[in-house]
Structure formats: structure tokens, C-alpha cells
């Protein structure tokens, strides 16, 4: 039977590991969202350029 200190240590390590995983996952989600935003902005800019050039012709 583990002692109270061992149980507390296990709980702390489990909690710390879950917080670390959540932080990594949050960073991943943030970077994916930023990448998609930049891709969309680039596509919109390219579409605007194409519209300008087609209007000139």
C-alpha cells in the first residue's frame, strides 16, 4: 500500500504531465490556426491581384 506522500507524488506527476500535454496541444492548435489564416490571407491577396489584372485588360 503506497503511503500518502507517494500518492501525492503520483498525483502531482500525473497532473503535471497532463498540463504539459494540454500546453503542447494548445500550441499545436494555435500554430495550425495561424497557418490556415496566413494561407487564406495569401489566397485572398492573390485573388485580388488576379481581379485587378483582369479588370485592366
UniProtKB/Swiss-Prot annotation:
Q: Which Pfam families match?
A: COX14 (PF14880)
| PANTHER family in UniProt | CYTOCHROME C OXIDASE ASSEMBLY PROTEIN COX14
Location of the protein in the cell? Mitochondrion outer membrane
Q: What is this protein called?
A: Cytochrome c oxidase assembly protein COX14
Residues assigned to the Mitochondrial intermembrane compartment are 1-14
Write out the topological domains of type Cytoplasmic: 38-57
Q: Which UniProt keywords apply?
A: Membrane, Mitochondrion, Mitochondrion outer membrane, Transmembrane, Transmembrane helix
Quaternary structure (record)? Along with COA3, core component of the MITRAC (mitochondrial translation regulation assembly intermediate of cytochrome c oxidase complex) complex.
How does the UniProt record describe the way this protein sits in the membrane? Answer: Single-pass membrane protein
Protein encoded by which gene: Cox14
Quick one: a GO cellular component term?
A: mitochondrial outer membrane
Q: Which residues cross the membrane?
A: 15-37
Described function: Core component of the MITRAC (mitochondrial translation regulation assembly intermediate of cytochrome c oxidase complex) complex, that regulates cytochrome c oxidase assembly. Requires for coordination of the early steps of cytochrome c oxidase assembly with the synthesis of MT-CO1.
Q: Which GO biological process annotations does it have?
A: mitochondrial cytochrome c oxidase assembly
